[in-house]
């Protein structure tokens, strides 16, 4: 486990879990096997989907600077971070930037609370202090805080 001061320098954190759905598990194994047997063929098969994703990301990069973060959303970021007891302002800055990026990737013209709610667990879960009296996971703690603070 890294020190909190180092974890705070990571912008986002994701939890990677093994899929529980059997069909999804089988599909993952099939795709991995297809790649192992024919990497070039696999890349060719997914080329169109990768190109579409790349274009979507490039479009988002171009539009991100035009998206203004409204004051009410900045206040929401600050309220959530304050309620979670995050140190410093890096959490608010990361939450604001990642929310803006997600909104741009979504192709919307306005940033809203839905974008914030989606991004908050990734931006905040690794910044939480451990609470020995609360055995819920950090993702759930962030979700609970969002509900309590933002409704």
Residue positions per predicted region:
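Acidic catalytic patch
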Residues: 66-77
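Conserved RecA-like P-loop NTPase ATPase core
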Residues: 10, 77, 99
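Conserved nucleotide-binding/hydrolysis micro-motifs of P-loop NTPases
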Residues: 17-26, 32-34, 123
């Amino acid at each position: 486990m890294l020190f909190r001061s180092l974890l705070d320098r990571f912008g986002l954190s994701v939890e990677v879990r093994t899929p529980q759905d059997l069909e999804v598990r089988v599909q993952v194994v099939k795709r991995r096997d297809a790649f192992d047997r024919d990497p070039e063929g696999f890349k060719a098969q997914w080329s169109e989907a990768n190109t579409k994703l790349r274009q979507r990301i490039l479009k988002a990069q171009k539009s991100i600077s035009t998206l203004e973060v409204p004051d009410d959303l900045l206040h929401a970021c600050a309220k959530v971070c304050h309620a979670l007891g995050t140190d410093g302002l890096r959490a608010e800055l990361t939450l604001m930037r990642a929310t803006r990026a997600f909104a741009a990737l979504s192709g919307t013209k306005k940033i809203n609370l839905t974008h914030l709610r989606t991004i908050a667990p990734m931006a905040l879960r690794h910044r939480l202090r451990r609470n020995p009296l609360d055995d819920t996971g950090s993702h759930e703690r962030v979700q609970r805080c969002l509900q309590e603070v933002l409704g």
